[in-house]
Amino acid sequence: MRSSWLPALLLALAWPAVAADLHAQVSASLMRPEPRALRPMQWSPPPTLIALYFGADWCAPCHAFVPTLRGVRDALREAGADTEVVYVSLDESEAALRRYMHLQQMPWPVLDPRRAQRMPALQALAGLAPPNLVLIDAQGTVLANGWQGRHYRGLQPVLQEWWKRACAQQQAHCPDDGVQPR
């Protein structure tokens, strides 16, 4: 008889290797939404900081959050930070995913939904409900997560950590007037 704690234990033991692969798996699974389909895309080179945005078309708080996410992302990129958002859809269909990205004018890539379902490390980061934001570095290390186990810390702590780390990059010239997320 199998125990339900065994998969969690195996994932915990394998976490360093899984974390190292997470950035690479995300980078290898990127898609660009087009009106009728998702098309593969590649980064050259991949950014050093990735904000994984877990959301869905059916989620009202997700719709409310996207303008803030887009504003922070655009400000960081304009400042020269090497960072990008990747959307991880929790929608039931590719059509809903594309509709949500189009309605919200998301300029960033989306993770291939079929591949995302086969990434246990990614699924473990999603949290119990959307929206969620997870910041990872080039080694796949999780730097901030809106969910800590079953406790929802919220999106603001992740946005603040993202701003701090992105602005600490040598090439970034972030404004000193406190434009960071509130």
What is each model feature region?
Residues A56-A60, L90-A95, R115-R118, G140-V142, ...:
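Solvent-exposed loop/turn segments at secondary-structure junctions
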Residues A51-L52, V85, L133:
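Hydrophobic beta-strand anchors of alpha/beta hydrolase catalytic cores
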Residues M1-R32, A144, A172-R182:
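N-terminal targeting signals for export/organelle localization
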Residues L135-R182:
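Thiol-/selenol-based redox modules, centered on thioredoxin-like
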Residues F54-G71:
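Conserved redox-active cysteine motifs that mediate thiol-disulfide chemistry
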Residues S27-I50:
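A short beta-strand-turn-helix
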Residues H102-N132:
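Short, internal strand/loop/helix patches
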Residues V66-L103, Q117-P120:
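Structural microenvironment flanking redox-active thiols in thiol-disulfide oxidoreductases
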